[in-house]
Design a protein with these regions (language model features):
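Alpha-helical and His/Cys-centered functional microenvironments
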Residues: 7, 31, 50
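N-terminal signal peptide c-region/cleavage motif recognized by signal peptidases
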Residues: 33-35
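Gram-negative and organellar
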Residues: 38-412
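N-terminal secretory signal peptides that target proteins for export/translocation
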Residues: 1-18
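Sec-dependent signal peptide recognition
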Residues: 17-27
Length: 412
């Protein structure tokens, strides 16, 4: 697809090698921000942003590992340009979000990368009883260093296509269904075993109470295909699987200020090869939100669930954890938010190769504190400090990391 910018030259090209599409968005932002074009119900909202971050352990270097002369901390700078689109045509609602970033690391230039975040959605309606969503997303970014600590640039691409719909059978009953396809790929050869395609189908039925609360059940089937076999010594493993779920789904409006959400039930995963890795057990997630006052909000969450991960030694982890967050609006322009999180991950997917890989369990504690300031309706400034502590039974994978992020965003 051709991505040439308009002929009008708004300002000179800066030295950063951004994609052409990002500069098109910048030009569009200046043009649509002119007084003659601006409107309160603006459909297209371009924006630009800039951020500076410092992390004292970018690569997740383990405690007690001797790395003489190796750089583990770095300051990074991220420039971004994007556009948000929201358009309503009758009952139909169309939305799009496009974001392009350029991130540069001062001490680790080999990690410099261009990122993309593209999202499209059509919230469709047919009469008063049928509605749903049809959309797609694409995200390209640097993969996290949780389980991979090398200095090579490891870009991860995630693509998702989805469709869902609901039918209001009765004022008190709603039938819903959905399908999706998720594709994840890595650039780095060492991570190719983690490439996967997951296809999901879901069917649910909800009771809609007059109070606004809902209670229902849902069935979900997921097929996960790993095109590249995992090599562990002399073993060659196929991590493809089928997963079935039967869960209860509850959204309880306890009061006008308190809401409780629950999703939990039986989950069963069967692998195409090596049944010792199969899983069957209860999974659940609960979220509680409390608006304590007009300015203070509190969120509490707890979970026990299996999930995929960025690691080539396990097909899944069993994650159990809890988090506590709060948001405090000091004024119309100033907000403070923070979160405490504790999670334990059991690498159960390595059971088949216990003779090759040791049993592994990780515990992660994370604390964040942020400040957001909006001096004008278009400009947002932010600062965030964080501290992570990872403790692992796997040698060399226990490490702390502390960081600070300063960011800004201007929406035209």
């Amino acid at each position: 697809m051709k991505q040439d910018c308009p002929v009008i030259e708004v300002f000179p090209m800066p030295p950063l090698p951004w994609p052409r599409a990002a500069w098109c968005l910048l030009h569009l932002g200046v043009l649509t921000s002119l007084p003659a074009l601006a409107a309160p119900d603006q459909v297209v909202r371009p924006y630009v942003g800039y951020a500076v971050a410092h992390d004292d352990n970018v690569l997740g270097a383990g405690d007690g590992v001797d790395r003489p002369g190796e750089v583990v901390s770095s300051t990074s700078r991220r420039a971004e340009a994007g556009v948000l689109v929201d358009k309503r045509i009758g009952q139909q609602a169309l939305s799009a979000a496009l974001r392009f970033t350029r991130t540069s690391y001062e001490q680790l230039p080999e990690l410099n990368n261009d990122g993309k975040d593209l999202r499209l959605n059509w919230n469709w309606h047919v009469g008063n009883h049928l509605d749903g969503n049809l959309g797609a997303t694409y995200v390209q970014a640097l993969a996290p260093f949780v389980n991979f600590h090398g200095r090579e640039r490891n870009l991860r691409s995630e693509r998702r296509e989805f469709a869902d719909g609901g039918w209001l059978l009765h004022p008190s009953w709603r039938l819903r269904t959905g399908v999706s396809r998720d594709t994840l790929t890595y650039d780095l050869d060492a991570q190719q075993a983690g490439n996967r395609v997951e296809k999901m189908g879901e069917l649910g039925l909800d009771y809609l109470a007059p109070s606004g609360s809902t209670i229902g059940t849902q069935l979900r089937h997921t097929r996960g295909d790993y095109p590249n076999r995992q090599q562990l010594g002399a073993l060659s493993l196929d991590n493809s699987y089928d997963q079935d779920e039967l869960k209860a789904k509850v959204s309880w409006l306890i009061t006008g200020k308190t809401q409780l959400q629950f999703l939990g039930g039986l989950v069963q995963r069967k692998h195409d090869a090596f049944a010792a890795r199969d899983y069957r057990g209860l999974n659940a997630r609960v979220n509680a939100n409390w608006q304590a006052s007009a300015k203070l909000g509190v969120a509490l969450a707890g979970w026990r669930e299996i999930g995929a991960l960025d690691d080539v030694t396990a097909s899944y982890t069993l994650n159990q954890g809890a988090s506590l967050g709060a948001t405090w609006d000091l004024s119309d322009k100033l907000r403070i938010d923070g979160q405490l999180k504790h999670e334990t991950s059991d690498y159960s997917g390595t059971a088949v190769v216990a003779s090759v890989l040791p049993e592994r369990k990780d515990t992660v504690r994370r604390a964040t504190l942020g400040l957001v300031y909006k001096p004008t309706a278009h400009l947002r400034l932010g600062a965030q400090a964080y501290r992570n502590e990872r403790r692992s039974t796997l040698a060399g994978n226990s490490y702390p990391t502390t960081g600070l992020l300063l960011n800004s965003r201007y929406e035209f």
